[in-house]
Each structure stands twice: as structure tokens, then as C-alpha cells.
């Protein structure tokens, strides 16, 4: 179990076995214990692989308290550990290391499972309480660190990555058809599902106790999305007060994330979020901060000029790399590292960026979370515009949508724009909650049903993949629809897509990525903030731009959001074209009886003949089939993939 996770912790490994007979528990949230066999009759077996960041010499895990009755394995970072440590010492606790890990142990002794509510950081951890004979597991509030688990009759097994659990002898590898439907809808498998039956993800902001063969799971944190007028936590009355609070909170978040005993730097794309983080870091540093960006030969996917301009203004030590993405070489590596089908194609540049960054530093700060917390995506503008449409009389809406569509240019160059407008107009015909599904989904419900074979379609009877997103909308029913949409993304798209992408890509190269926007103090401030300060005249992240204008070049303040993408459309008509036929129409894929081969062939044909841009859909199908070939077809799973030579 440890060998498949060595990339997450190459510096050290260790394990703990309880010798108390009874239930058998195997797990590895930071990674697993190499010598543990699930047939053991131990009360608990804990294992860990370590990436050394704090207290490099004495941070060995599993780690215990003074008398060996509380043991922990921990993956992540606690940024307020120094303050908590001082408090615990005053209460009489004795420490033998300077690590944040040991702080959690003593905090648990003091406060039990409520300790998680005091932690400020990213984490997945497990604590074995010898006296109580119970296991306590928890995941951070926003889902920056992963935690998979499987409960059987006499055992709870869990790990940071699914592939670790599949190393247990006799591990079941039965695919969950509901998970496939969810994957095609969202391009990821959301929590609490996993791609395999019986395996689950602990959702963000949840903790669980396994005791006497029973697993009890509960949520421990919810962002304060109540209406601003009734929110006593943030009693601000003006934009200046909100702006001052934002500056103070985000600055503090950056400061505590710069605590490290190893070299650290920052990703710098040249966008608003990453530039703000790099600028705050530079303001706290007595030497130039290392910043990193990558570019591609295709101009529309290359942000290097903006990153270069930001680095020059901020005075950072900027590292710039140009890579030619080797998609054919990268695909099997993505399938292995991501454990489950994962079709966000920006995982490719994120992998490259993580690899080149790790050549210089061990820790990198990023701007992840800024878009979801402060309404930065274009789709939030679409939501706001749709609310305006909803206020029009029905006949006016019908006339206006027809007029817009008739005036749309029909050229091939405009097909992407036409597709977006068509999706927007189609969404206006359904209730607001389902409207968003039409805008963000890869395959909508009707298209998925067309793609499936009759036999597979029957396995999805009474299952509604849309419900995952619809449930998330209930978090703040009293707020405006744009705020409800951003809140939904914070619960769904952010942890399941963005943070999964970044965690896997960075840890694949033993790089720790820290995101100051994802400090729960920042998230709570953003949740309570009125929309009018985030979005002004259809422009998102307005308060970020205004508050940190001293760190942002004018060109970055006004630039259109680009995104971190790759030229899928081009690839599928060129170097990846043979792969569409060799993989998607291979006999192995057909024999799985998930898709109608004619529907797949039609999708390929429409794309290659320039009838429609199906690149995101084809990428999803390709990723899914390569996952099958990596994890289901072989008798054993390869324990590692070597890194490619990039530069």
C-alpha cells in the first residue's frame, strides 16, 4: 500500500500496530504502512509516508502522545499550529517535536473530536485512541486534502488515494454505474461516491468516528451564507469596511502559509488571484520570491506575457518555462495518478507546472479559490443576466432569444461562441437550479442517455445525477441566485475538480501547494459578503481588484479571464486523432457495454468533420476508457510512473 503512494511522501515512512485483539482497521491518510496485512488481528494499523516541510529531523509519523495512548497519521499543514502549541503548553502538555502534527494529538487530548474546529489549514488525518478503542478521521473544510475509505463487516480501510486501497489482497474492483453517470455529467466523480462500489470519499468539512464496528459521520463546518443583514459575524456597513477586512484576512492567510523549513515560491499565471498572492508574499519577504509560470507554443493558451509583467512589477525572481504538451505520453500518467476518471484537461498543464516548480522549491502558494469565492467565472455573469431575463414578460423573452439567435454569425470560427450562446438560451427555459446544470455539464441528461447502451441505461433507473448539484443549492436558499451558485461551486466544483486537480498534480511531484484564498477565515468573509461588492456591472472579483490594485498591473486588472487550458480541439484533429478510434472503438471498450458504439462513432465523426466541437466530451470518454485499461483490465496496478522529460 505504501509503494503506490511514495510520491506523496518520499522523505520518510513509518507505521504503528496495535496489539489489542478485535476489529481490524487498515488505513493511510498520509499513506499506508508497507508491512501491514489486512488479515492482522490488531486493533489498528496506521501507516505514513512523509514529505518533510516543518521540523525536518523529528517529524516522523505515526506520532503519539506522552504515554502512547493516542496515535496520529496526518497529511497536510496546520498553519496556526504555533499559536495552538503555546496554548497547549500553558495547559500542561509536553511536546517532543516542533511539528504541527503533534499539536493535533495534544489538541485531541484536550478537546476530543471538537479539536478539528480549532485547526486552520488543509488536512486529512486519523487518530487512534487506544483507551477508547476508537478511530477518529477528519478532512479539512474546503476539501484540499483527499480521504478515501471502505467499510466492511469487520474492518475500516482508508487512504489518501484510491489506488492504495486497491493494494489490499482481494480488494473488490466493481465499477459503480452511478459514478460513471456522475462523471459524464460533471467530468469528475463527486463525493461521497467513488468510481468503485463500496469505496467512498469523506466529504469536505466532515469528521467521522469508527467505534464498535460502527462509522458515524457528521459535518462540522458550514460557511455563513445567511443574509448579510442578519449576519452578526461580519457587521460591516460599507464597501470600505469589507475591503479592509478582506485585505487584513488574506494578508494574514498568506503570512501563516509562508511558515516552512524548506524553500517555497508561488505559481504566477498573470491572473488577478495568483498576482495578488505573489504580491502579498513579496511584501513580507526580504528577498525576491520565486515565482513560476509555464507557456505553450499555441498563443491562445499562453499567459506568459501577463505573468512576466506581474513579476516585473512585484520584483519576484521569476522562472518561466515553455513546454510542448506530449498528450500521448501524459494520458496514461494522468490515469494512474488521478485514481478515478478525471476529465478536466487543465490537469495536463498543472502537472507540467508542478514538475518544473518542484525543481526549485518544495512548497508553492497558489491563487486557487479566488474565482469561486469572489464570483470570477463568466458563468456567474450568465446567471446574473438570466435573472434579468426572468423579469421580462414571457412574450418579450421569446422574441429576444429568437432575435439573438438569428443574428448570430454562422462561420466555423464563431462555433464556440455560438455554442455558448445556445447553451445560455436553452438554460432560460428551465428553473434556475437546473439552468446552471445545462451551462456547466459536459454531457447533459439527454445526451448521456443517447450515448449509453440499452443495458447500461437500465442500471441507472431512478438515479438522477443532477441531484448532487441541486442538493448543494440548498445551502443558502435566502440569498440571490448568483451567490447561491458561487456557494454551490464552493461545495462541488472547487473540491471535486479544482482542488483534486491541484492536489494530485502537485503531490505527483512531491510538491506541497498552499492556497491562501482557501483559509476558512477568508471563505467565511466571502460567504457573508454582499454580491454587489463582488460583482459590479457584470464584472466579477471587483472587490479583489479594487482592494489590491496596488499589486496589480493595469493590464491584469482589465484583462479577460483566459483559464489554464490546452488545445483539445486541435489535438483531436491531429496527433490524438488515431487514439479516438484505437481506444474508444477498441473491442475492449465495446465489450464493456457502457456506450452504444454507433453513438460514439457519430460523436467522433461530427467533431472531425467540423460539425461540432465535441472535444470536452471526447476527452471525457478517452479518460474513462484509459482508466479502465489502467485499473480494471490489469491483474495488478503499476506502483509508479516515471516523470517525463519536459524541457
Show the residue positions of the predicted features.
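Structural motif
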Residues: 39-40, 91-99, 114, 173-177, ...
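Short amphipathic alpha-helical segments and their helix-coil junctions
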Residues: 87-92, 166-167, 465-480, 527, ...
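PAPS-dependent sulfotransferase catalytic core
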Residues: 552-611
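Cysteine-centered catalytic environments shared across enzyme families
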Residues: 1-338, 350, 354, 549-550, ...
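Globin-like tetrapyrrole-binding proteins
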Residues: 494
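Glycine/proline-rich, flexible active-site/cofactor-binding loop segments
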Residues: 69, 453-487
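ATP-dependent adenylate-handling active sites, centered on carboxylate activation for C-N bond formation
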Residues: 24-25, 87-90, 110, 130-156, ...
Amino acid at each position: 500500500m505504501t509503494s503506490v503512494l511514495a510520491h506523496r511522501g518520499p522523505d520518510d515512512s513509518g507505521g504503528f500496530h496495535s496489539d489489542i485483539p478485535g476489529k481490524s482497521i487498515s488505513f493511510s491518510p498520509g499513506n499506508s504502512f508497507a508491512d501491514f496485512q489486512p488479515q492482522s488481528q490488531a486493533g489498528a494499523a496506521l501507516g505514513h509516508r512523509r514529505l518533510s516541510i516543518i521540523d525536518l529531523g523529528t517529524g516522523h509519523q505515526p506520532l503519539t502522545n506522552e504515554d502512547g495512548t493516542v496515535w496520529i497519521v496526518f497529511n497536510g499543514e496546520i498553519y496556526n499550529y504555533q499559536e495552538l502549541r503555546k496554548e497547549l503548553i500553558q495547559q500542561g502538555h509536553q511536546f517532543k517535536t516542533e511539528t504541527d502534527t503533534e499539536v493535533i494529538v495534544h489538541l485531541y487530548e484536550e478537546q476530543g473530536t471538537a479539536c478539528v474546529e480549532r485547526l486552520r489549514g488543509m488536512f486529512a488525518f486519523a487518530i487512534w485512541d487506544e483507551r477508547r478503542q476508537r478511530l477518529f478521521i477528519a478532512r479539512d473544510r474546503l476539501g484540499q486534502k483527499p480521504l478515501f475509505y471502505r467499510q466492511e463487516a469487520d474492518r475500516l480501510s482508508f487512504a489518501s488515494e484510491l489506488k492504495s486501497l486497491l493494494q489490499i489482497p482481494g480488494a473488490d474492483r466493481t465499477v459503480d454505474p452511478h459514478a460513471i453517470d456522475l462523471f459524464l455529467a460533471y467530468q469528475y466523480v463527486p463525493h461521497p461516491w467513488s468510481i468503485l462500489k463500496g469505496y467512498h470519499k469523506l466529504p469536505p468539512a466532515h469528521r467521522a468516528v469508527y467505534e464498535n464496528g460502527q462509522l458515524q459521520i457528521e459535518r462540522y463546518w458550514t460557511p455563513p451564507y445567511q443574509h448579510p443583514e442578519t449576519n452578526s459575524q461580519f457587521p460591516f456597513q460599507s464597501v470600505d469596511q469589507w475591503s479592509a477586512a478582506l485585505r487584513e484576512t488574506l494578508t494574514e492567510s498568506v503570512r501563516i502559509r509562508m511558515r516552512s523549513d524548506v524553500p517555497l515560491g508561488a505559481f504566477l499565471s498573470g491572473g488577478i488571484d495568483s498576482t495578488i498572492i505573489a504580491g502579498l508574499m513579496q511584501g513580507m519577504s526580504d528577498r525576491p520570491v520565486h515565482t513560476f509560470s509555464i507557456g505553450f507554443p499555441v498563443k491562445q493558451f499562453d499567459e506568459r506575457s501577463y505573468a512576466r509583467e506581474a513579476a516585473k512589477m512585484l520584483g519576484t525572481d521569476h522562472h518561466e518555462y515553455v513546454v510542448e504538451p506530449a498528450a500521448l505520453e501524459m494520458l496514461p500518467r494522468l490515469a494512474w495518478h488521478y485514481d478515478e476518471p478525471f476529465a478536466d484537461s487543465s490537469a495536463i498543464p498543472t502537472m507540467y507546472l508542478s514538475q518544473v516548480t518542484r525543481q526549485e522549491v518544495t512548497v508553492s502558494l497558489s491563487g486557487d479559490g479566488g474565482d469561486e469565492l469572489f464570483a470570477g467565472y463568466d458563468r456567474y455573469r450568465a446567471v446574473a443576466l438570466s435573472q434579468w431575463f426572468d423579469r421580462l414578460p414571457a412574450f418579450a423573452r421569446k422574441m429576444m432569444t429568437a432575435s439573438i439567435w438569428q443574428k448570430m454569425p454562422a462561420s466555423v470560427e464563431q462555433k464556440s461562441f455560438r455554442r455558448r450562446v445556445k447553451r445560455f438560451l436553452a438554460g432560460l427555459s428551465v428553473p434556475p437550479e437546473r439552468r446552471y446544470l445545462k451551462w456547466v455539464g459536459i454531457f447533459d441528461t439527454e445526451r448521456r442517455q443517447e450515448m449509453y447502451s440499452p443495458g447500461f441505461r437500465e442500471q441507472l433507473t431512478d438515479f438522477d445525477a443532477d441531484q448532487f448539484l441541486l442538493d448543494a443549492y440548498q445551502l443558502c436558499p435566502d440569498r440571490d441566485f448568483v451567490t447561491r451558485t458561487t456557494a454551490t461551486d464552493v461545495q462541488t466544483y472547487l473540491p471535486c475538480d479544482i482542488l483534486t486537480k491541484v492536489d494530485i498534480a502537485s503531490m505527483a511531484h512531491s510538491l506541497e501547494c498552499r492556497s491562501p484564498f482557501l483559509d476558512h477565515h477568508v471563505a467565511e468573509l466571502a460567504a457573508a459578503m454582499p454580491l454587489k461588492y463582488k460583482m459590479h456591472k457584470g464584472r466579477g472579483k471587483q472587490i479583489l481588484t479594487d482592494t489590491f490594485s496596488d499589486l496589480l498591473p493595469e493590464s491584469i486588472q482589465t484583462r479577460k479571464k483566459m483559464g489554464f487550458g490546452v488545445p483539445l480541439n486541435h489535438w483531436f484533429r491531429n496527433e490524438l486523432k488515431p487514439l479516438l478510434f484505437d481506444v474508444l472503438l477498441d473491442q475492449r471498450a465495446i465489450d464493456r457495454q457502457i456506450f452504444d458504439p454507433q453513438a460514439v462513432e457519430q460523436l467522433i465523426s461530427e467533431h472531425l468533420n467540423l460539425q461540432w466541437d465535441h472535444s470536452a466530451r471526447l476527452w471525457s470518454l478517452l479518460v474513462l476508457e484509459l482508466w479502465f485499461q489502467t485499473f480494471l483490465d490489469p491483474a495488478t496496478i503499476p506502483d509508479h510512473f516515471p516523470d517525463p522529460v519536459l524541457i
